[in-house]
Amino acid sequence: MNDRPAHFGTAYALLRAAADVADHWVQSDVCAQAKGATDAAPVVYEDPKTQAKTTFGTSGGRRACAWHVVTYTATQGLVLVAGTRVLGVRLHPAAVAGALAISGLTHYAADRRVPNGLLHRLAKKTGKERFYKLANFGMNGAYALDQAWHHGWETLAALTATAGANRR
């Protein structure tokens, strides 16, 4: 019996659910606000508790995005390993590491929202710039394209994670 489709579906569901939790609940407010900061377009973050203000430039934006990706990838790794263990799927450690590397690196590339960043440039090249800039009627084009980017790469990550998978 070929269990690979079921293993893929399991890995994808776990990675996707973990990504939503990591992106929307685990990510800190400061990382969400500062991860796109550059020296040319700094972000001033005001702590909601202390009202202390911190200005983030390029290095601070990179650190904020990197920390977000660390927590994002750790969340995905924890959920993927725990979930597959509960479901009786044995993943190869190297495949899991590869999957998390794909997810984490591509997440950083998309989330480092510098002016004219990767997703904005891709939107321009594919004729989606107007959608990327959409921010009315309850829609946010940049966010929708960001999530589509993550879903696509998580599909590849799930395929990678299940390479050599078998039953426990």
What are the functions of these language-model segments?
Residues 1-168:
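Hydrophobic alpha-helical transmembrane segments
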